[in-house]
Design a protein with these regions (language model features):
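Flexible glycine/proline-rich
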Residues: 24-29, 37, 80, 262-402
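Short, glycine/charged-enriched hinge/interface segments at domain edges or termini
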Residues: 13, 18, 57-223, 365, ...
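Solvent-exposed alpha-helices and their adjacent loops that cap or buttress functional pockets
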Residues: 50-52, 63-66, 84-88, 101-103, ...
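Helix-rich terminal scaffold detector
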Residues: 3-7, 166-293, 297-303
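Short, low-complexity N-terminal leaders and the immediately following helix N-cap/first helix
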Residues: 1-68, 318-347
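Short, hydrophobic/aliphatic alpha-helical segments
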Residues: 32-45, 82-94, 282-283, 287
Length: 402
């Protein structure tokens, strides 16, 4: 087991862990939040035919070179109709948004730029070819549009439907067990006794797991009993693809996750040189990847964002740009001095906002690792190198959390 390693080394070591990935066919209505297992190509041209981008008149542009031209109305082109009028010289057809372009027409006049007079229409504005949406200008039949590894959101779902697919092959959601440990933990809604606190980590971590496109399986709190912990880890290993624990990984007498992993598990490393989040443990329990996260809420979130999320995305075959990711690396200008951390990567919480000359980072709340409110008040983390202080005006690397 390696002890006290850099974040880059930790990422390299977790890269040796994995789980079996499977796929399944998912109906269109259930695709949001899923990851594509194979590329998707369009089954159709989009648009499928030349059509109007607005309500108005389908005309021949050569008939409308001057304002006040009067044309004979010869019919109407409606969306969904397969009966098209034909427009000849001196004629116009009513046309609705999305309706096919009548034969002979090559331009559209907006209805607001016309005056209808019986069976004639006076053209008061220009005829514009640009108001016509051309066949296949958005998508071409057979064109590959979405690569494997794409996280499907609302826009992707609509696009998949537009391409003619009623289902898609997706990565089966891996099951991630989430286990909080500690005698002091009580479920929200129960009145606290002296020395107790509400259990929050499993809810936050489960939400992060779900946001990555995986399925979280929350376990009941495991109190500080090594037999109970062993039983719970065994159950998690047999029913999950990966295990997240929070608490019990530091150097105290009751840090049982670390003790049990060292005695009976297969630990890869313990302690990463970051602040906050320094004492994470990683390895395998009964062949199942296990991440032992710190008990402090902020530390557990930071370790998940910087270590677990990239690993989970890779194991699910996520595309590096279109797949799930919870943070993007950006450059920001510090608006204030930030003290770094001796020998550790400083991941201070920051609020990233657009400034006049780029992204600006500020801090807004107390930075204690137990203050989960600071993760709400901020939307980023600094990446200040070890033994380095950040000065106001410095341009630094940061994670912009999504």
């Amino acid at each position: 087991m390696e002890v006290g390693i850099s974040l880059d080394r930790a990422l390299a070591l977790v890269g040796t862990l994995s789980f079996a990935r499977s796929t399944e066919t998912t109906p269109l209505s259930d695709l949001t939040g899923r990851i594509l297992a194979s590329p998707l190509s369009s089954k159709v041209d989009d648009p499928a035919f030349d059509n109007s981008a607005m309500d108005g008149w389908a005309v021949r542009a050569e008939d409308c070179t001057s304002e006040g031209t009067i044309l004979k109305i010869v019919g109407t082109s409606r969306a969904g109709s397969n009966q098209l009028p034909e427009v000849s010289a001196g004629q116009a057809s009513r046309i609705m948004t999305g309706a096919p372009l009548p034969l002979g027409a090559d331009a559209i006049v907006m209805v607001e730029e016309s005056a209808e007079e019986g069976n004639q229409v006076k053209i008061l504005g220009p005829a514009r070819p640009g108001y016509i949406r051309k066949k296949g200008e958005n998508l071409q039949k057979g064109q590959q549009i979405l690569p494997a590894g794409t996280l499907i959101g609302p826009a992707e779902t609509s696009l998949i439907a537009t391409m003619g697919h009623h289902e898609a092959e997706t990565v089966s959601r891996p099951v991630v067990a989430v286990i909080s440990t500690g005698d002091e933990l009580v479920q929200p809604g129960i009145e606290l006794s002296p020395g107790q606190i509400y259990e929050s980590n499993s809810y936050g971590l489960a939400s992060l797991v779900e946001k990555m496109g995986a399925s979280a399986k929350r376990f009941d709190v495991v109190h500080d009993n090594i037999e109970d912990l062993r039983t719970t880890l065994d159950e998690a290993a047999s029913s999950s693809d990966a295990i997240l624990t929070s608490g019990g990984v530091s150097m105290g007498e009751w840090d049982l996750v670390r003790r049990l992993m060292e005695d009976e598990g297969e630990p890869l490393f313990w302690k990463v040189l970051i602040r906050p989040g320094g004492p994470p443990l990683c390895g395998s329990w009964k062949g199942t990847p296990l991440f032992g996260l710190p008990g402090n809420p902020v530390s557990s979130h930071v370790v998940f964002l910087s270590l677990v999320a990239p690993w989970l995305a890779r194991c699910m075959g996520a595309d590096s740009k279109l797949g799930p990711r919870l943070a993007d690396r950006v450059r920001v200008r510090l608006s204030e001095d930030i003290k770094g951390a001796p020998k550790k990567l400083c991941m201070r919480r920051i609020r990233i906002e657009a400034g006049e000359d780029g992204l600006v980072a500020t801090t807004h709340t107390h930075q204690g690792s137990g203050n989960i409110h600071s993760m709400v008040a901020h939307n980023g983390l600094t990446l200040i190198p070890p033994d380095t202080d950040g000065k106001a005006g410095d341009i630094i690397d940061a994670l912009w959390c999504r």
